[in-house]
Amino acid sequence: MHKDIKLVKETEIRKPIGSPFIVYFSSISNNTHRFIEKLGFQHKRIPVDITQSITVSNEYVLICPTYSGGGNQVEGAVPKQVIQFLNNKHNRELCRGVIASGNTNFGDTFCLAGTVISKKLNVPLLYQFELLGTKNDVEQTQKIIANFFQNSN
């Protein structure tokens, strides 16, 4: 995990109510999309095309890849499409947690997008996984999300 993680106090965590719902971004490589498909939860994708936008009406966990070059190159860690989505106050207020993907080849910036979003929105960073994720990552993410939602089916 990234060394700059802000710990969200238990009393500050706003657990979602209802069935698990995921909002995610995946580039044209579809790495994150393939991971999401394995989870089996209802989901909505943030469009790759920056001119398109979405609005959500459910509380959600955001799953976001990290874009940065490693080392001191931290600019652009959060994809522009995700920033645009979160700049919508309504969308931002419904986010309850974040899960990040990344590449361990980039060292300290591994899953940095999750750290950035967690700090900015004051939501917990629930999990991190590399690239496409492993079978264990899928299972752990399923458990984390199901437990995080108070009334999951």
UniProtKB/Swiss-Prot annotation:
Q: Which organism is it from?
A: Mycoplasma genitalium (strain ATCC 33530 / DSM 19775 / NCTC 10195 / G37)
- Gene that this polypeptide is encoded by: nrdI
| Top-level taxon in the UniProt lineage | Bacteria
Q: What does this protein do, in the record's words? A: Probably involved in ribonucleotide reductase function.
Q: Which GO terms describe its molecular function?
A: FMN binding
Q: Which family does it belong to?
A: Belongs to the NrdI family.
Tell me a GO biological process for this protein: protein modification process
Question: InterPro entries from the xrefs?
Answer: Flavoprotein-like_sf, RNR_Ib_NrdI_bac, RNR_NrdI
Q: What is this protein called?
A: Protein NrdI
Top-down, what is the taxonomic lineage of the species of origin?
Answer: Bacteria, Bacillati, Mycoplasmatota, Mycoplasmoidales, Mycoplasmoidaceae
